[in-house]
């Protein structure tokens, strides 16, 4: 296994994987290692913070990381922030009062399934030559100042 990389990213979740992809886009020759403590792929139903994106987050995923087609095909569109009120109808959400924009929001956003998104990001990272090391724990960091 290769032991020297230009960049080592600790954490193979949404932030680490998107950073690795953006760095590789900026410099295709850079060598990147992503270290993740999880034993393998993320579970498809990984309920995490960041599932409901705002427009700026979606812009980054769609335009900067070129995930537009993937998001449109595999993730749910989100039509702005919505609230469902009146708890008298707990069993049927369609009978609750809904508060939110009446028109389609001009800038798209998505309700993300983080597990499937992170697995897609990992797949794209590997395809670009980014090494992902699963089931790893960082206990010490040595910085080579000569590089």
Region spans (language model):
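N-terminal Rossmann-like dinucleotide/flavin-binding domain of flavoprotein oxidoreductases
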Residues: 63, 117-131
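N-terminal FAD cofactor-binding segment of flavoenzymes
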Residues: 42-91
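A conserved short coil-to-beta-strand element within the FAD-binding core of flavoproteins
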Residues: 134-147
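Beta1/beta-strand and adjacent pyrophosphate-binding region of the FAD-binding site
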Residues: 1-15, 33
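Glycine-rich Rossmann-fold phosphate-binding loop(s) that bind the pyrophosphate
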Residues: 12-14, 37, 114
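Short beta-strand to alpha-helix junction loop
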Residues: 56, 102-123
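Glycine-rich FAD pyrophosphate-binding loop
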Residues: 8, 24-49
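Conserved Rossmann-like nucleotide-cofactor binding loop
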Residues: 15, 19, 40
């Amino acid at each position: 296994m290769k032991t020297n990389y230009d960049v080592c990213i600790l954490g193979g979740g949404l932030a680490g994987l998107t950073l690795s992809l953006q760095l590789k886009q900026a410099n295709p020759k850079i060598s990147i290692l992503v270290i993740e403590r999880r034993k393998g792929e993320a579970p498809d139903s990984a309920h995490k913070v960041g599932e409901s994106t705002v427009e700026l987050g979606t812009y980054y995923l769609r335009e900067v990381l070129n995930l537009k087609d993937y998001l449109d095909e595999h993730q749910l569109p989100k039509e702005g922030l919505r609230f469902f009120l009146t708890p008298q109808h707990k069993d049927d959400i369609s009978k609750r009062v809904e508060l939110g924009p009446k028109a389609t929001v001009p800038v798209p956003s998505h309700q993300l399934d983080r597990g499937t998104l992170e697995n897609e990001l990992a797949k794209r990272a590997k395809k670009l030559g980014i090494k992902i090391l699963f089931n790893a724990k960082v206990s010490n960091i040595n910085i080579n100042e000569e590089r």
